[in-house]
Amino acid sequence: MSIKVERNYLEINSLKDLKKSKFPPDDCLIGLSDPADFQINKFFYKSIGKEHRWTDRLVWTDKQWIEYISNQKVKTYILKKANDMAGYFELIFHKEKKETEIAYLGLLKEYQNKNLGSFLLTSAIKNSFSCLLYTSDAADDRIG
């Protein structure tokens, strides 16, 4: 049995092109995962990804996860709702292109359909522009 998988891409060249979410929920906070913790990325990737057929990292060893999130070009942000982890996004800065990729973004199943997705996406886009300004020139060029 084969399943058709579609990938969609969004390109935003300026924050003025962004239609922001209407509100940040009162009990929600998005913050950088610092220090980086591969277990958090692995948890979200597997938990959210099983619903969306994310498979490329399922074969990764802990060493591969650690190498990935240790790369200075990779930043992980966590959405917390009432202090519980609800979702995440990963940003990857591509120095040579002067652009930032939202590598993965998602909400845990129990937080879906609660008006959090637009808030998470808006934050990911805003932070992707910040990443362009603050990523170190000394960042390692390898990803994955």
Can you name each region flagged by the protein language model?
Residues M1-L29, D34:
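Acyl-donor-binding surface of acyltransferase catalytic domains
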Residues K22-R57:
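Short amphipathic alpha-helix that is part of the acyltransferase structural core
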Residues H52, I66-I78:
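A short helix-loop-beta-strand connector motif used in the catalytic cores of GNAT acetyltransferases and
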Residues W60, K80-K81, A86-K97, Y104:
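A conserved beta-strand-loop-helix scaffold within acyl/acetyltransferase catalytic domains
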Residues L107, N113-K126:
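Conserved acetyl-CoA-binding loop-helix of GNAT-fold acetyltransferases
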Residues F129-S130:
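Non-catalytic positions within long, well-ordered alpha-helices that form the structural scaffold/packing
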Residues Y134-G144:
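Single conserved hydrophobic/aromatic residue that forms the stacking wall/gate
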